[in-house]
Amino acid sequence: MTAAPTDDVAVVLSHPGAADTLERLIASTQQLVAHFKVPATLYLTDDGTRPDAVQIARARGISVIPQAGHGYGGVLNAAVTGTTAAFIITLDADGVHPPELLPYFWAQRGAAAIVIGSRYIPQGHTQMPWWRRVCSRSLNGVFRTMLDLPFHDLSSSYRLYQRAALAPLAPVTAGDAALQEVLIKTFCQGHGVLEIPMHYVAVASGGRSFGTLLPLGLDYLAAFRKMWVLRNSVESSDYDTRAFYSRIPFQRYWQRRRYTILSGYIGDALRVLDAGCGSTQLLNRCPQIVGMDFGLRKVRFMRRPGRQLVNGSTFALPFKSEAFDIVLSSQVIEHLPDDPVIFSELIRCIVPGGALVLGTVDYGSWQWPLIEWMYGLAKPTGYAQEHITHYTTAILVERLTSLGLKIEQIEYICKGEIIIKARKLH
């Protein structure tokens, strides 16, 4: 078990270059981190191939940590298990990563869970053989576009990590594709990722060769397949946001039709709760909404200065009774057991005269079962298989009426989803 964090920052060097390059890098790094004015420890990972580098590091007072796996996956695993710092900075020790950038990483340590030295954002730059540049650009372009990611340099290994975000992912897959895996998993947990410009100059000797491209490509292909499943899973922090902006016309229409109906029901009400908000864009359309979700990753993703977000459960809403004019619960109850506590909790938080807005799919129609079957074929990692309670319009109307609510409006989306607005009379 890894000890609790003690050092503020661990600077982990890997892939050492020539002896004189390593000597200069260590000297520069030691001087630079001294200005951080916090406890800082330098480490060198040892994969067993460079005993001379280990000797240089120890002579300079650098701690050496064993690296069990190969590639950057092995480096990251060694960094997590072999250090105790709250922040971890990784950089290659062959001269391609300028240590002078370290203060810039440190200045952004609280801004994101991962800070990347990026070659492919404005003011970033790279100097490398043309074929490496083409391969690197293509790799990053495919991952960015196909996985719908907001960052540009997924293969840069010059990074700062917050241990709190990195440690739960360890051990990561060995190999260089671990860089993409860690980055995407962190983003899918709702953590922030920040890129800062870096100028990258490839070393004259060493590095990639044509002979390494095939095994590297196979590693990246395997990683891409895993990350494709994750990015299109409900486990991804931005699942609802991606659906709102989907490239699939029908999915985009459905999401935006729901958004229009719900925002119309809310109107100009100021005290509004969205119980089970996920990463809905309704929070941007109606910024007065208090968003609550059981999934912490969704709450993290939707954080904005001034926004009111709560990590909580629909079975025990963490709010006072009669705290809201409108309580909204959309696309939630079908994922939960049919428990009367859910309805009583939602109604408890509404003022007399306020309204409950409840949305779910309608299993009483023929349209939704057909849509669900087709959706399951097209997107097997989507929501459909998680619907454990099947409601119909008749069941919901009867349930809400029996609880003292008056049905005011009912809207449908393609006859497959029902959205009800019901008034709390007393």
Spans of model-derived segments:
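Short beta-strand/loop segment that forms part of the nucleotide-sugar
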Residues: 37-48
